[in-house]
Amino acid sequence: MSYRLIIGIVPHNAGDEIVKAAAKAGARGGTILMGTGTASSNILSLLGFGSAGKDVVMILVEEDIKDAVVSEIVESTQTKKKSFGVLWTLNVSRFIRCGNERGGKTEMNTAADHQLITLIVNKGYAEDAMAAARSAGA
């Protein structure tokens, strides 16, 4: 089975609208992350990235419904301002495999030079958490 990851960057608090439109077209839901832009320019403003606060929306769908989901998202945002945001898709089928597709073999290299630390903090504390991580060597 083939999968596509739909990624959108939209104004802050507009992510729910994107996920609802996707669900209406058959998606099973989505993930909304709070994003913060760091650069400002006329080009970024033209692309819809003018203000710093953004929602990054990720929706995983099967290939056969991708076009319907994207169309529903675009249609649901047509009444918004011209530069509402940006939307694109990635083919992630090679990254997503069911356990039985590889015969149950473990192919992960357990020796790693890096570690992933995931942290969930209350709204407004992200910069404090990042500052603490950087001071600890991250």
Question: Where is each model-derived feature located?
Answer:
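Positively charged, small/polar-rich N-terminal and surface patches that mediate targeting and assembly
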Residues: 1-138
